[in-house]
Each structure stands twice: as C-alpha cells, then as structure tokens.
Amino acid sequence: MAKENSFDIVSRVDMQEVLNAVNQALREIETRFDFRGSKSRIIFENKPEITLISDDDFKLRNVIDILESKLIKRGINLKALRYGKVESAAGDTVRQVVTLVQGIEQDIAKKIVKAIKDSKVKVQASVQGDQVRVSGKNRDDLQLAINVVKGTELDIPVEFTNYRTI
C-alpha cells in the first residue's frame, strides 16, 4: 500500500506574543517624551482584538507605529491585523479597534485550493474548517505545493503545519 503524505495550511497568531508586544509598546508609550500627559493607551484582553486609544489622529498613528514595530520584533506578521475605522471616544480621544485574524476564511481557502489545482501539482487540497489540508503520494509534490502557496498573493499570513505520513 502506498503511503500518503499530508500537511495543513493554517493562519494563526500566537496570543502570548501579542500580549508581550502590547506590554512592550505600553512601556514605550509611558516613557516617551511626546506621550507625556497623553491619554494614549492600548487595551488587549486576550480576545482577538486590540483597542488603541489616543488624544488625536497623529498620536494614534504613533501608537500604531510603536505597536507594529513591537509586533514585528515578536515575530507577528502584520498581515494578521485588520484595522477598523478611527472613531471618536469619550474625553476628546479617538479610538481604533485592530482585529487579529485567526484561521483561514472560506474565500481565501478557496483561492489557495484553486492555486494548487491550477499548478497541476499531483496533490489534493481540501478545505477543512479554518484550514486547508494538502495530501499527496510524493513529498516532493508537497514541497511544490508549498512553493505555489508561498507564491500566491494572500492577505493573511500562512503557516505549514502537521506534516505526516499515513
């Protein structure tokens, strides 16, 4: 019987690393001269969203820059962030909600499957919930499928996990 190899394509964010990045960003905001006396803060409660609050749009943009730099240093891909619109908040402040993308949405999963099928690589790709499973007889074909997915323009960060031989 021939062995079947497979792997999963997933999109996930390490919430502990996000928490660490938020804490580092808060520490920098507290110590920076241009934020002295400011109402700028970052709220993250282990939900897949971060709330940014600041005095005005300019300081909010600076808070975003600080947060993004800390996320990059912690290994979080910025494609995993979805920015909401800037809205007015209480006390002459502005607020913006940043959502963290977890899982692969159906339309993006279909795009991945289509890209793999269009490449004519001898593998099967199927959507399974919020991930895509790719299976095939040859490991080299799986490597080609990984390269196809890496070459596809996606709006989310993807990881290749759960390699196995059945």
From Swiss-Prot:
<dbReference type="InterPro" id="IPR035570">
    <property type="entry name" value="UPF0234_N"/>
</dbReference>
<protein>
    <recommendedName>
        <fullName>Nucleotide-binding protein Dred_1927</fullName>
    </recommendedName>
</protein>
<dbReference type="GO" id="GO:0000166">
    <property type="term" value="F:nucleotide binding"/>
</dbReference>
<comment type="function">
    <text>Nucleotide-binding protein.</text>
</comment>
<dbReference type="InterPro" id="IPR035571">
    <property type="entry name" value="UPF0234-like_C"/>
</dbReference>
<comment type="similarity">
    <text>Belongs to the YajQ family.</text>
</comment>
<dbReference type="InterPro" id="IPR007551">
    <property type="entry name" value="DUF520"/>
</dbReference>
<keyword id="KW-0547">Nucleotide-binding</keyword>
<dbReference type="InterPro" id="IPR036183">
    <property type="entry name" value="YajQ-like_sf"/>
</dbReference>
<dbReference type="Pfam" id="PF04461">
    <property type="entry name" value="DUF520"/>
</dbReference>
<dbReference type="GO" id="GO:0005829">
    <property type="term" value="C:cytosol"/>
</dbReference>
